[in-house]
């Protein structure tokens, strides 16, 4: 019996009357009964693995299933390594922020953007500022003017609850 925990059918689990059988090195056994294909696999000391159940007739391959599963897991790990993790850095501002403080925060934002990180600017609205969220949008527009040379606006300044948020992403680097 099989020891697999995924959905791949092996050996006796394959219950189709006829299957197209392929060998490990590309040998073609043609269309044979599944019991005959299983016997060929057992004679070779390998497993019969169903690789295309939707085909007419279904396609089975004679191979070492342990080795096959190891290679599949290895491919998945490689694909996972190549996936790019998007990191979002958050910079908090207030409506009454001084221009020098804005410049300081923008300097940090530019460093993050140069490291290919996304940056979310957040203006916190306190008390009566909640009734006038447009002032927070204006602060973010001032910030945008300072970073637009190296960034692309991913999300426009928009009030969301007690905050006004804007997200910027780095401009794609030009390949020379």
From Swiss-Prot:
Q: Which UniProt keywords apply?
A: Cytoplasm, Initiation factor, Protein biosynthesis
Compartments (UniProt record): Cytoplasm
The biological process GO terms on file are:
ribosome disassembly
Its GO CC terms are: cytosol; membrane
Q: Name one Pfam family in it.
A: IF3_N
Q: Which domain of life is it from?
A: Bacteria
Q: What molecular function does GO assign, one term?
A: translation initiation factor activity
HAMAP family noted in UniProt: IF_3
Q: How does it assemble?
A: Monomer.
* Task performed by this protein: IF-3 binds to the 30S ribosomal subunit and shifts the equilibrium between 70S ribosomes and their 50S and 30S subunits in favor of the free subunits, thus enhancing the availability of 30S subunits on which protein synthesis initiation begins.
Family designation: Belongs to the IF-3 family.
Write the protein's name.
Answer: Translation initiation factor IF-3
**Origin species:** Wolinella succinogenes (strain ATCC 29543 / DSM 1740 / CCUG 13145 / JCM 31913 / LMG 7466 / NCTC 11488 / FDC 602W)
Gene (name only): infC
